[in-house]
Swiss-Prot record:
Gene3D superfamilies: 3.30.70.330. SUPFAM superfamilies: Ribosomal proteins S24e, L23 and L15e. This is Large ribosomal subunit protein uL23. Keywords: Ribonucleoprotein, Ribosomal protein, RNA-binding, rRNA-binding. It comes from the Bacteria. It comes from Dehalococcoides mccartyi (strain ATCC BAA-2100 / JCM 16839 / KCTC 5957 / BAV1).
Length: 94
């Protein structure tokens, strides 16, 4: 897997903006990615030093479409802690 395929998109919410003050940023990541891949991808893409990577798997939910039940897609999320003094400017001003 290419390192630029690992990070899908940044996750921006109120909770994540509070975490950004503590140098923690959240990204949606590819299903097959592991912590080493995520760390390398963030360090190469944003020129920062990653201290820690926490990963979560959020399962999909069942929704109703008329009489039918469908399963929504799940999500894989990574919370990245950066070294003190480093910032990702992608999240600023949001």
């Amino acid at each position: 897997m290419n390192l630029y395929e690992v990070l899908r998109r940044p996750l921006i919410s109120e909770k994540n903006s509070v975490h950004a003050t503590q140098n923690k940023y959240a990204f949606e990541i590819a299903k097959g990615a592991n912590k080493r891949m995520v760390k390398l991808a963030v360090e190469q893409a944003f020129n920062v030093t990653v201290e820690d990577v926490n990963m979560l798997h959020i399962p999909g939910k069942q929704k109703r479409m008329g009489r039918n039940l469908i399963q929504t897609a799940g999500l894989r999320k990574a919370i990245i802690t950066l070294k003190e003094g480093d910032k990702i400017t992608l999240f600023e001003g949001v």
